[in-house]
């Protein structure tokens, strides 16, 4: 292509949620444009009216904005090449399809759905690839249908579609940035419908016209569009337009290497947003679904700026990319480590405040929502959580009394003498002037020695009493953060509620 500003586009259909595959397509287009000092635009391809879903446009836009993929031009942001919604460009498509009709590169087809299906079934029975039988190809284009019959139907206002005429006995060469040279035989390509009977164009016509008029230099899209590429290349030739460069991205696969589908897990960006994945982690993970820097580079954690700096289409592979949630979780944890404790405490506070609207705490709300208190929680739990919300949900005991106790831990840790030991030790804790981890640890060790028991005979049941679970951070630090009053209250409550259970 001649030297010009790089322009890429993401052109989704507003038929539902933003799929993670769509996020990857948008991201790669965004990264490539930004890496090369170009522009990235968002275009809505809403010509399939039967599949439109209310609210899908808003969902697409909000998901992309959440991910930090901000278009330079879009229905929301405007631009010099609008409208950016295909249903608002119908007159443009009619103009270009008329040009193809006038130049005998397209023709009217009045075949009914039943006729098309009957022909398709016959071809399958004959063992040939189903394609349109060209019944309505006019005589002056090499077919057998008289122009008079076509005109009669047009004059009567009968519903029809407009099809492109695929050249016979032609080999079509496609140079793909990712896949190299791919050849297509025109005998395998159907006379594609360009304009439907409702006056709306199909994807094939609209996308080619729009990409040309919007000066798109690179079409980066999923592998599923590779088989349609010969039709698009022919349309560029029909119109005499310079072709953009194409790059077809590898399929996304489930761990069993089947095509990624909702049956085996979440596929919507909003699902991962709801689960608490950060935008940095999800973008990082999605970027690695097909792309890497190459051999010898061990880096796997990237910021958006680093991705822009390092991304190239030449490093995108051809083979399918496995969507591994374990890898996503690892990347999520790495990104969490990069966030300051202060910022994490602020984010956790917002979650806790919402939680307190639904659930009452016996601890003073001004204490547990205090910045210093939350910072202590974050510092204690930072290495134990993967998501910001887990500072609240996984660590509820910092904010709420245990409502239940881990059953297996009761059977294993609550001995015949546990209630007596805890009741007495509670009095020792109450007498501590400095309720810090060192003082608590020292008091427990002395009391255990006095009673002739191992420290564990106190540590495990106290942890259960204070937190309701058998795992967590250092008990002494946990108790220090929660504070004397809450610890004493929880130990007393557990002694009242729990008893030794014989095996």
UniProtKB/Swiss-Prot annotation:
Its EC number is 6.1.1.17. Its main location: cytoplasm. GO terms for biological process: glutamyl-tRNA aminoacylation. GO terms for molecular function: ATP binding; glutamate-tRNA ligase activity; tRNA binding; zinc ion binding. The keyword Protein biosynthesis applies. A motif ('HIGH' region) lies at residues 12-22. PANTHER family: GLUTAMATE--TRNA LIGASE (PTHR43311), GLUTAMATE--TRNA LIGASE, MITOCHONDRIAL-RELATED (PTHR43311:SF2). Monomer. Belongs to the class-I aminoacyl-tRNA synthetase family. Glutamate--tRNA ligase type 1 subfamily. This is Glutamate--tRNA ligase. The lineage of its organism: Bacteria, Pseudomonadati, Chlorobiota, Chlorobiia, Chlorobiales. The gene is gltX.
């Amino acid at each position: 292509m001649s030297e010009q500003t790089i322009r890429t586009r993401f052109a989704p259909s507003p038929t539902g949620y933003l799929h993670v595959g769509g996020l990857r397509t948008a991201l790669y287009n965004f990264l490539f444009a930004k890496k090369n000092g170009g522009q990235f635009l968002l275009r809505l391809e809403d010509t399939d009216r039967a599949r439109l879903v209310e609210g899908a446009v808003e969902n697409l836009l909000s998901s992309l904005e959440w991910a930090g993929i901000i278009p330079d031009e879009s229905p929301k942001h405007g631009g010099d090449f609008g409208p950016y919604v295909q249903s608002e460009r119908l007159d443009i498509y009619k103009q270009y399809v008329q040009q193809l009709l006038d130049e005998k590169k397209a023709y009217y087809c009045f075949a009914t759905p039943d006729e098309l299906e009957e022909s398709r079934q016959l071809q399958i029975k004959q063992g040939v690839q189903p394609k349109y039988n060209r019944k309505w190809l006019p005589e002056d284009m090499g077919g057998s249908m008289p122009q008079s019959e076509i005109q009669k139907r047009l004059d009567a206002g009968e519903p029809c579609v407009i099809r492109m005429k695929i050249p016979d006995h032609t080999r079509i060469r496609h140079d793909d940035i990712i896949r190299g040279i791919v050849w297509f035989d025109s005998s395998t390509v159907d006379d594609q419908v360009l304009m439907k009977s409702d006056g709306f164009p199909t994807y094939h016509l609209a996308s080619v016209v729009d990409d040309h008029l919007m000066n798109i230099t690179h079409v980066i899209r999923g592998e599923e569009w590779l088989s349609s590429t010969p039709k698009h290349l022919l349309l560029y030739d029909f119109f005499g337009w310079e072709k953009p460069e194409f790059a077809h991205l590898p399929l996304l696969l489930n761990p069993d290497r089947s095509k990624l589908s909702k049956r085996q897990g979440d596929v919507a960006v909003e699902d991962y947003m709801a689960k608490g994945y950060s935008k940095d982690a999800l973008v990082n993970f999605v970027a690695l679904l097909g792309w890497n820097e190459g051999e010898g580079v061990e880096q796997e954690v990237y910021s958006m700026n680093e991705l822009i700096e390092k991304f190239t289409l030449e490093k995108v592979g051809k083979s399918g990319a496995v969507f591994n949630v374990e890898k996503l979780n690892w990347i999520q944890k790495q990104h969490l480590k990069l966030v300051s404790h202060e910022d994490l405490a602020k984010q956790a506070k917002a979650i806790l405040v919402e939680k307190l609207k639904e659930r009452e705490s016996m601890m003073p709300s001004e204490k547990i929502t205090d910045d210093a208190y939350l910072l202590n929680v974050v510092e204690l739990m930072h290495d134990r959580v993967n998501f910001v919300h887990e500072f609240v949900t996984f660590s509820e005991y910092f904010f709420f009394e245990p409502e239940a106790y881990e059953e297996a831990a009761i059977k294993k840790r609550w001995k015949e003498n546990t209630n007596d030991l805890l009741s007495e030790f509670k009095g020792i804790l109450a007498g501590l002037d400095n309720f810090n981890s060192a003082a608590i640890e020292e008091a427990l060790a002395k009391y255990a020695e006095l009673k002739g028991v191992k420290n564990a005979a106190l540590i495990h049941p106290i942890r259960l009493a204070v937190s309701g679970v058998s795992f967590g951070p250092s008990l002494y630090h946990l108790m220090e953060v929660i504070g004397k009053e809450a610890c004493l209250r929880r130990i007393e409550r557990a002694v009242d509620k729990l008893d030794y259970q014989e095996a």
